[in-house]
UniProtKB/Swiss-Prot annotation:
Coiled coil: none annotated. The gene is adk. SUPFAM superfamilies: P-loop containing nucleoside triphosphate hydrolases. AMP binds at T31, R36, E57, L58, V59, G85, F86, P87, R88, Q92, R160, R171. Consists of three domains, a large central CORE domain and two small peripheral domains, NMPbind and LID, which undergo movements during catalysis. The LID domain closes over the site of phosphoryl transfer upon ATP binding. Assembling and dissambling the active center during each catalytic cycle provides an effective means to prevent ATP hydrolysis. Some bacteria have evolved a zinc-coordinating structure that stabilizes the LID domain. This is Adenylate kinase. Its EC number is 2.7.4.3. One of its GO terms (molecular function) is zinc ion binding. ATP binds at G10, A11, G12, K13, G14, T15, R127, T136, Y137, G199. One of its GO terms (cellular component) is cytoplasm. Pathway: Purine metabolism; AMP biosynthesis via salvage pathway; AMP from ADP: step 1/1. It comes from Ruminiclostridium cellulolyticum (strain ATCC 35319 / DSM 5812 / JCM 6584 / H10). GO terms for biological process: AMP salvage. Keywords: ATP-binding, Cytoplasm, Kinase, Metal-binding, Nucleotide biosynthesis, Nucleotide-binding, Transferase, Zinc. InterPro entries: Adenyl_kin_sub, Adenylat/UMP-CMP_kin, Adenylat_kinase_CS, Adenylate_kinase_lid-dom, P-loop_NTPase.
Length: 214
């Protein structure tokens, strides 16, 4: 199954992608991870992306699509993938469609994990991340056993700058302007499925599996 994951920042896409990945035995392809891997590996595509990022500029859609295309061409994507973090705009979706046609890949589902803004703000402003191992917690839903200390490696946990309430509001505003139109785009293409993302992870997972017909 070939899946694109849609949803606001903090909707739980990464968590659900991991669950789907394990259930279907297909890779979770996170564009953020691909960028980091290409830059760290000093690949030609990574070098190009780094030039833009070092100047504080956005990586052009054409280059992002090339990086995604390169990853989807890997052998582990033959039986499917979960693409998370791309596309974010209509032009990106159109670029991706062209690339998938070139690769003879048919997209099965664009899955929207739908969460209300107020729930997103609650989730994200309460999120804490370990400074060492990257483990994620939430002061309301999933607190550390010892306040401020990671359960896994005993390092300090912090609130990332982009999880502060004001920043979350700005990110949601950007999401609604840029990414929301994708919902209409994939609905018109007959690819859209929606799963309610509020509540516990297990509850959301059941709704996700139902939406995917699994």
């Amino acid at each position: 199954m070939r899946i694109i994951l849609l949803g606001a920042p903090g909707a739980g896409k990464g968590t659900q992608a991991k669950i789907i990945s394990e259930k279907l035995n297909i890779p979770h392809v996170s564009t953020g991870d691909i960028f980091r891997a290409n830059i760290k590996g000093n690949t030609p595509l990574g070098q190009k992306a780094k030039e833009y990022m070092d100047k504080g500029e956005l990586v052009p859609d054409e280059l992002t699509v090339e990086i995604v295309k390169d990853r989807l061409g890997n052998v582990d994507c033959v039986n499917g993938f979960i693409l998370d973090g791309f596309p974010r705009t209509i032009p990106q979706a159109e670029y991706l469609d062209k690339v998938l046609v070139q690769m003879n890949i048919n997209l099965d589902v664009a899955l929207l994990i739908d969460v209300k803004d107020e729930d997103i703000i609650k989730r994200m402003s309460g999120r804490r991340v370990c400074t060492n191992c990257g483990a994620t917690y939430n002061v309301v839903f999933n607190p550390t056993k010892v306040e401020g200390i990671c359960d896994v490696c005993n390092s300090p946990v912090i609130q990332r700058a982009d999880d502060a309430a004001e920043t979350v509001l700005n990110r949601l505003e950007t999401y609604h302007k840029q990414t929301q139109p994708l919902i209409n785009y994939y609905e018109k293409a007959g690819k859209l499925k929606v799963a309610e993302g509020a509540g516990e992870v297990d509850e959301t997972s059941k709704r996700v599996m139902k939406a995917l017909g699994i």
